[in-house]
């Protein structure tokens, strides 16, 4: 745990969660606790509210295919499903994650949501690139990749997406780092503490998102949200 840090540039340190072989009780406990932390801080609402904005003028009788990349155990998609049911949308929801244990757990937790399916899949694979979807969700996911990977991925994904890519990710800021360090005193999970601090340092400044927007030739729609999140909506 580093006390003196710089947020000028994104770190290239890897998180423990980048190892897709991690599974068992450790991963399940990590995903459960992350869900609780994100709900407490209001992070999941950033994604749902972004979706609400994108669907503002969408006819409710038309089916909407939404893919959540890096879905973990599916908490975001279950929130999206609840939103869809409440507002009478016809959602087809697909969760994708490279960790097979996460996908198994997502299926176990989503038996009451027939509109959800989960798949173990690599977002850089041809299988993913051949998907045709309306909306792609990326919540606390893009910071796992380097800028050149993200520019390539976003360029390809825009071609297969009919409406929008919705990004909800971390603001790289010293205060966010130290606040998480303080919060970690109450977290009984070493994986979350390690990865949470690295995640902040792998996060983004507004300028990073603006530069990537230019590179993929889209008009940036970037808003800062609590707690140290950037909402980045890329609409077609």
Question: PLM features: residue spans?
Answer:
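C-terminal alpha-helical "lid/dimerization" subdomain adjacent to the S-adenosyl-L-methionine
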Residues: 170-213, 222
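N-terminal, positively charged/glycine-rich alpha-helical extensions of SAM-dependent methyltransferases
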Residues: 1-32
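A short, conserved alpha-helix within the catalytic core of class I
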Residues: 145-156
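Class I SAM-dependent methyltransferase SAM/SAH-binding core
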Residues: 67, 73-75, 80-125
């Amino acid at each position: 745990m580093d006390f003196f840090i710089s947020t000028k540039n994104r770190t290239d340190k890897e998180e423990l969660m980048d190892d897709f072989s991690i599974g068992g009780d450790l991963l399940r406990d990590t995903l459960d606790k992350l869900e609780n932390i994100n709900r407490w801080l209001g992070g999941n609402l950033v994604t749902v509210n972004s979706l609400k904005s994108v669907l503002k003028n969408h006819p409710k009788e038309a089916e909407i295919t939404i893919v959540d990349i890096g879905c973990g155990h599916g908490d975001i998609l279950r929130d999206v499903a609840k939103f869809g049911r409440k507002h009478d949308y016809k959602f087809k929801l697909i969760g994708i994650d490279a960790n097979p244990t996460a996908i198994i757990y997502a299926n176990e937790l989503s038996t009451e949501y027939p509109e959800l399916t989960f798949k173990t899949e690599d977002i850089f694979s041809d299988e993913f690139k051949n998907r045709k979807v309306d909306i792609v969700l990326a919540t606390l996911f893009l910071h796992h990749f380097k800028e050149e990977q993200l520019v390539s991925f976003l360029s390809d994904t825009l071609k297969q997406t009919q409406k929008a890519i919705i990004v909800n990710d971390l603001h790289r800021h010293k205060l966010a780092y130290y606040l998480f360090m303080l919060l970690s005193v109450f977290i009984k999970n070493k994986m979350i503490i390690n990865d949470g601090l690295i995640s902040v340092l792998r996060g983004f400044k507004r300028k990073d998102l603006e530069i990537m927007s230019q590179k993929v030739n889209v008009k940036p729609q970037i808003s800062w949200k609590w707690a140290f999140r950037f909402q980045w909506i890329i609409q077609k």
